[in-house]
Every structure is written in C-alpha cells, then in structure tokens.
Amino acid sequence: MNIMRTAMLLAFMTALFMGVGFLIGGKGGMMIALVIAGAMNLFSYWNSDRMVLSAYHAQEVDPRNAPEFYEIVRGLTQNAGLPMPKVYIFDNPQPNAFATGRNPQNAAVAASTGLLQALTPEEVAGVMAHELAHVEHRDTLTMTITATLAGAISMLGNFAFFFGGRRDENGNGGGIIGPLVAMIVAPFAAMLVQMAISRTREYAADRRGAEICGNPLWLASALAKIAGAHQPNYQAERNPATAHMFIINPLSGQKMDSLFSTHPDTSNRIAALQALAQEMGGRQANVYRPQHSKPAASGPWGSSAERSTDDPWGVKGGASTRSVPKIGRRGKDNDAPKGPWN
C-alpha cells in the first residue's frame, strides 16, 4: 500500500511540475519540467532525509552526549525488531518530533530540545515509539519525498510569477493567466500533500507505537502536553511542506480534524489511546521502561534532577527541570520573522 501510494504521489507531483512548466514555457517548458521532475524524484529518494534534517539544523547524537535519550531509542528499537536508526536533536522550543529516511535500514528519528525539556522519560518513550512505528510502516519514505517535492513545486510557482507570461499566441504566450494559475499551484500542492498522506497513518502509528513501548497512556500524556504547549515553530512556518512529518502539526491555526488538515484532532487521538489502554489492560508484559537516573545524580537528559510527581496518566514524574544535551545553536533559526512593522 505504501509503495503504491508513493508511486501515485510521485506521479501527481510530476504532473503538477509539468503543468507549471507548460504555463511558463509551452511544450518546451513542459519537457524541461519533466526532466527536472525526474531528477528531483531521484534526488528526493536518496537525499530528502538529509535535506529535512538540514532544514531544522538537526544534529546527530550518540551514547556519549545524549546517553538517556539514545538508550530510550535503542530500547524501543529492540522492542520493535527494527534496525537502529540515527538519532538527532534539533534546537526548537516547541515540543515535537519526526522520523525520516527512505527505509528502516536508512532511517533517522529527531526530537526537539523543547520535547526533551517538557516531557518525562516515559512520555519521550511514547513519542519515539510513535516515530519508530512510522519507520516500520515505511511512512517515512512518503513523508520525506512529499516534503521535498512540495517545496520544489512552490518554488516553481514563484518562478512562474516572476518569469512567466511571455509566450506568444502561437503556443508561446499565455499572458498573465499562466503565471496566475501557477501561483495557485503552491497552495494546491500543499493540499495534495495533506490529502496524499492519509491521516489514518497517524492513528496506525499511535497504535503501533503504544504496542512498541507497551503503555498507550505514555503517548496520550505526551500528546496532551505537546498540544497544550502553544510554542511557535518558525522553522516549520518557513518550511510548511514538512508539517505532516511531525507527531503534532507544528503550524499554527490548524486544530480541527478538517478534510485537509495534516493531522487528526489531538483529542481524538488521545481518546483512541485511552480506549487502547483499556483493551491492553493498561500495560503489556513486554513494556519498555526507560532507565531513570538516580535522584542525587544528573537528570535523564544531562544535568538536574527530576521533580517527582505523578500525573493523572499514570506517568511517573512530572515535567522536569532537566537540561538537554548541548547540540550547538546555529543562529536564531526559530526567531519570529522580521516584518516591516518590527
């Protein structure tokens, strides 16, 4: 099913590419767009994961600089029977995470610094189990290719606005109509991405993730915290084609389970996980248990100890005052964009 969905998606994206090329340069432009689309498809297959990780300045971590987080991913990977993915952290205050890679053998999972600061180890385990479920289902191939191609189509639409409309009436001129139509392609391509990546994959990943970590309430608690954080993600605002890759939509203003939303409504996902917890009897025998650091020693992510309070989801320990591994900041990537009034 994922292979067929990916093939259909690539065909749609290629057709859109060719259509914009025709509006810009007629038949010649269409053929050039076809060649570019073919090259883009191949490039996306091999390199889109690196492009997405680069867009968020994600940095790879290992057992030396992020021991607890890395061990959580390692333990969950063993539970799932998957190859060990590369593990990344990206500097962003919004609690969120995503997976990428063309197959389980070439996969990567990434968590934001905000996620590691806001969630308990059990909740982090629930989130990363969800991302590993995407890897297992090979959703990551579809997600990474669509993110790259949708962004490329948006750029081609902008190109049409500035350089289109110069063909003559014999097939070499479309006036201003062509560029105007091309300008519509960018949002339409984003809509196609949202439709092509079915929201049902999130429910499936939630369910499989709960099976991997062994406790659906860990993920339910994490989703509630992430949704309630209300932290902007300006990196995602600048790269909206990547929004569907995250565990919760990083963009503002999309809270309803509408036809074209990138994610199901969070409350619906939490309700499904609560029902699954009852079905599973709360916990499974093979539940994964993150290894907490000793209270007197450094905290799970690197420095301070946890505040020990139980929350209503059955997750031990509330949000902690721990710090996260230092991954190095590259400028102010998540600063609000500067406009003419500021």
From Swiss-Prot:
It is found in: Cell inner membrane. InterPro entries: HtpX_protease, Pept_M48_protease_HtpX, Peptidase_M48. Keywords: Cell inner membrane, Cell membrane, Hydrolase, Membrane, Metal-binding, Metalloprotease, Protease, Transmembrane, Transmembrane helix, Zinc. The keyword Glycoprotein does not apply. Zn(2+) binds at residues 130, 134, 202. Its main location: membrane. Its cofactor is Zn(2+). Residues 290-342 are annotated as: Disordered. It is an enzyme of class 3 (hydrolase). The chain crosses the membrane at residues 6-26, 28-48, 145-165, 173-193. The keyword Hydrolase applies. NCBIfam families: PRK01345.1, PRK03001.1. HAMAP family: Pept_M48_protease_HtpX (MF_00188). This is Protease HtpX homolog. It comes from Allorhizobium ampelinum (strain ATCC BAA-846 / DSM 112012 / S4) (Agrobacterium vitis (strain S4)).
